[in-house]
Every structure is written in structure tokens, then in C-alpha cells.
């Protein structure tokens, strides 16, 4: 007799065996890729995470990608460019040793250029894209405000070393005058590798650097702690860009997740 079967006997002595009782399994929670909400502890579905099918049912995920937003400026800015060209800059900056002199690009004496009325339209454009970055990419209701902003001018042969932007959350660069065939900015991967394998083809997983081509009038926004540099200008025309930093307006964080930062108490 099968295990867990029930023996029924009728009055005639004939035996009837009921089928085994099936054990009901509790429903298994459906697993899904998501992110943990630090406030509630709940796992929320990840929105827009990049995936790729690898064949045989294998799926490749790109966790924690770095957001870099490129925004075109579609209005005429000839007046703003003329003002920018005439803006005073610091003297030529040199580095390296006697046998290997490096000529760095020059920065404007004014480190709050976006406060100037001559650049009011450019500032409005940048602020609108900052709001988009915060709302649609960072999914936050907070507001980022522009702190410092300055011009960078590079003659032929001038460059800028690798760096990050401290005391800033999102940084940006607007390019009013560049040569579109020469990428004006290079990013370095946050995933530094101690062991290097031979590489047949570079991709987002094995590349250490990424040179980003830009067009005149385009704006780029990126996390301020993302290491970047500026390759040497190889053209006769001066390369000009406008850089800026940002910081959240008002208090930051959340009390429940123990990340609350009352900036009004720090004054």
C-alpha cells in the first residue's frame, strides 16, 4: 500500500484504497532583480537596468552603471561665445620636469561665470538639464544648485591631467568651441584591476578608459567623483569649455535611514 494511503473497508469486506494525499507546497515568492529601499527594507524592481542575452538562456546584467548625460544646445549662442572668448584667464600653467614639460589648459579668473548676466541663457539651459538628471536618473525630488563655474581654454598642445571634482555631487562641462573630430574628454573606469588579461576587443567591462566625442554646443553631466582628463588639443583653433560643480539645496538624506544631513545647522 502506498505510504500515506488511507484504507477504507466496506461492509462486504472489500477494501478500497484512496489515492495518496498530495502535500500542498507553500507558494514560493517570485524572485526579481531589484534594489533595496534603505527606508523600508523592501526590494523594489530595478527600472531600466541594461541586459544582454548571451545564448543558451544566459542573461548578462550590468549592475550599478555610471550615468553620463549628453544634452545638445539648439539655440544660437554666438553672443555668449564672443563674451567667453574675451574673458580673462590665468597665465599659462606648466607641469612635469625639465625634459617633459606639460602645458595645461588655462582657467578663467572668474570662477563664478554662470552668475554673469551675459550667460543667463546658458545657465537656464544647464539648470533645466540638471533638474532632468536628478528627477529622471537619480529619481529624487531634491534640487541641485550650481556652486562654482569657470572657463577652460586650451591652445594647441595644452591638456588637463586626470582629476575628480571634490565637494560636488554632479559636475558638467559645456562645449561652445571644440573640434568635433577630437574627443575633448576622457573618463577612467572606477573598477581598477590589479590583474590584466589579454584583450581581443574592448567593451564596457574590460575598458580602463573611454574617450567621449562631443559636438559644439553640447553639455555633458556626470558624477563628480568620476575620474576624467582632457587630452592635448591638436588643432590650431583654441578649445573652449565651461565647467561647473553642483550641490544639493537645503537639507539632505533621510532620518529613518540615518543619512539625514541638516545643513542649516552647519552654518
Regions found by a protein language model. Give the residues of each.
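Short linear clamp-binding motif
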Residues: 3-12
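Catalytic core of non-heme Fe(II) oxygenases with the double-stranded beta-helix
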Residues: 152-221, 251-260
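Short beta-strand His + acidic residue motifs that chelate non-heme Fe in jelly-roll/DSBH
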Residues: 160-163, 228-235
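Active-site region of the double-stranded beta-helix
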Residues: 117-147, 155-169, 176-180
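Non-heme Fe(II)/2-oxoglutarate
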Residues: 50-138, 159, 238-239, 246-267
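Acidic, proline-/serine-/threonine-rich low-complexity intrinsically disordered repeat tracts
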Residues: 14-35, 40-54
Amino acid at each position: 500500500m502506498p505510504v500515506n494511503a488511507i484504507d477504507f473497508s466496506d461492509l462486504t469486506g472489500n477494501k478500497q484504497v484512496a489515492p495518496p494525499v498530495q502535500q500542498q507546497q507553500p507558494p514560493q515568492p517570485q524572485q526579481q532583480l531589484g534594489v533595496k529601499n534603505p527606508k523600508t527594507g523592501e526590494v523594489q524592481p530595478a527600472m531600466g537596468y541594461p541586459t544582454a542575452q548571451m545564448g543558451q538562456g544566459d542573461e548578462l546584467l550590468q549592475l550599478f552603471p555610471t550615468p553620463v548625460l549628453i544634452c545638445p544646445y539648439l539655440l544660437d549662442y554666438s553672443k555668449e561665445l564672443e563674451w567667453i572668448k574675451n574673458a580673462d584667464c590665468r597665465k599659462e600653467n606648466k607641469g612635469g620636469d625639465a625634459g617633459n614639460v606639460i602645458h595645461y589648459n588655462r582657467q578663467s579668473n572668474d570662477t563664478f561665470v554662470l552668475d554673469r548676466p551675459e550667460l543667463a541663457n546658458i545657465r537656464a539651459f544647464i539648470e533645466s538639464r540638471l533638474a532632468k538628471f536628478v528627477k529622471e536618473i537619480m529619481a529624487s525630488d531634491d534640487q541641485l544648485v550650481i556652486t562654482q563655474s569657470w572657463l577652460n581654454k586650451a591652445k594647441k598642445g595644452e591638456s588637463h591631467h586626470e582629476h575628480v571634482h571634490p565637494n560636488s555631487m554632479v559636475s558638467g562641462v559645456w562645449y561652445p568651441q571644440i573640434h568635433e573630430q577630437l574627443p575633448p574628454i576622457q573618463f577612467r573606469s572606477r573598477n581598477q584591476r590589479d590583474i590584466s588579461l589579454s584583450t581581443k576587443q574592448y567593451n564596457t567591462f574590460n575598458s580602463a578608459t573611454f574617450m567621449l566625442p562631443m559636438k559644439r554646443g553640447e553639455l555633458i553631466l556626470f558624477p563628480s567623483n568620476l575620474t576624467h582628463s582632457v587630452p592635448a588639443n591638436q588643432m590650431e583653433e583654441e578649445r573652449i569649455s565651461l565647467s561647473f560643480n553642483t550641490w544639493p539645496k537645503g537639507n539632505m538624506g533621510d532620518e529613518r535611514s540615518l543619512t539625514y544631513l541638516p545643513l542649516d545647522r552647519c552654518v
